[in-house]
Amino acid sequence: MILTLFSTIIRRRWFLVCLASILVIITLNSCSPSEFKTKAAQVSQIVFISPSDPDTFNSPQSESLFSRIVFGLLYDGLINENGVTAELEPALAESWEISDDKRRITFTLREGLKWSDGEPFTADDIVFTYNEIYLNEKVPTGVRDILRIGTSGAFPSVKKLDERRVEFTVPEPFAPFLRYVGGITILPKHILQESVRTTDANGNLKFLSTWGTDTDPEKIIGNGPYRMVNYTPSQRIIFRRNPYYWRKDTQGNSQPYIERIVVQIIENPDNQLLRFRTGEIDSLEVAPEMFGLMKREEKRGKYKIYNGGPASDTRFISFNLNKARNHKGEPFVDPIKSRWFNTLAFRQAVAYAIDRETMKNNIYRGLGELQHSPVAVPSPYYLSPQEGLKTYSYDPEKAKQLLLDAGFKYDSQGQLLDWDGNRVRFTLLVKAEEKTRVDATVQIQQDLKRLGIQADLQVLNFNVIVQKLQSRNWDAYVGGFGGGGVEPHSGFNIWYSQGSLHQFNQGPQPGEPKITGWEPSDWELEIDRLFEAGVKELDDRKRKEIYGRFQQIVAEQVPFFHLVNPLSLEAVRDRIENIQFTALGGAFWNLYELKVQPD
């Protein structure tokens, strides 16, 4: 689950996305420049793409989505999530046991595990990583947020049982804990312990300045399938196979099979497409507007466009429901508009007024599905329309009737007026960086105009949008969140009424000026209770019922009206074998199994 709208969600959820597989993040695209093909004719390799340089090689401190490409190659988790089935599978841990009271998980490591420098990987590394890094208040890391258990926010405890066994204890049953803790990066104690226990001249832990991007890449030690050997900023990162990696196939051959990975840093999407069409790139995410061209060239270009079905991302329109006032006593939202937005019939009318079928066919070129829920379709907790989820088919007449029944009215020019004669007009935000989203927002503007509503479109830079949302200074916006995998609790900070990403009714946040008059609605508090119940319930059937009720509330109350979910499409060269493409895992979740045939 994977670009996101907000930078904070990257801090809080990058490690969750990695749970889909240590390598799911490589689905960002890939390329193979001719200079590397020439120099490495005898070396099997794939060249991936990153649109940006990594911000650091110190994974707990990274806030960059694209740094995950590096970490996915350098590290394995204790367990992996299968990119096809979403089932949890052994990785560094060969097995795990859960106590009868569901509060203790004991992991048993594989025998003979080693770091990429040949040193043993043991339970000491796990205990060190958790106790001295992730749970260390002096180390700023978003990982610590996801380790908070239940409503108390208490942390798990971890202790070594012997060289190969480690035990985690949680203060109360917490259903997602195994999936969360099993995928978090473990760091080498023998390399980093001194930096965590000593400070620099300014009194800061030396760890905070350790493994920056100016570090010799060969000094970055991992436990994953590859080791980093070269980094040229704004150009490329080169990885070689880790000779100490633990995986072997059924014949006893070492994995991964591919010797070298090159990550080319190419920011411009047009340049990425150009390089793919000239044969220099091995893989490319296929946007709807480029599908026709790429499909026509599929055979000549010797690639296949894989279709994983609907992506796990969400796209929606949302209104600002916040009734609070800032520290000066001024309302965040114009009270006149706030009354509209907080009228359920208004939100439902907007939902009926948006022609999503036309949006899917014209803007997404038919390469998408209507989206009805914040939970990804591949998730076992997804509630489908066939199972009773409320949906909104395009029905402008029903939309008008809902508004009239709620006390709205029309003037002689067909403009919608509220109870007091105010024209219904508001600002609709969308980020400029995604053409498809802008086009969809223009259509929404036109659909609402036919309903008598004037939506003034503002196409703004991503960072400006973030600032407006965080300051509560907005009316409505078209946005989206990256996929959180199959676990609904990964959206906790979006849906919990006091969550940091509860943008449609943002409560008080740490470090900001005092706000007054904020209150969550009854249905928001009900969602709080459902999320609290969902993480304590360990029976999957009952969890599905709990999260089904959550999805039904969202559908009925429409804090987000979900739009079109594009298909997960990726073009991959035919010479790369053993691809098992899914929307959940992408093309390269099983990179260790892939083979490359000579051109």
Where are these regions (language model features)?
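General beta-strand recognition
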Residues: V47, E89, R104-T106, R165-E167, ...
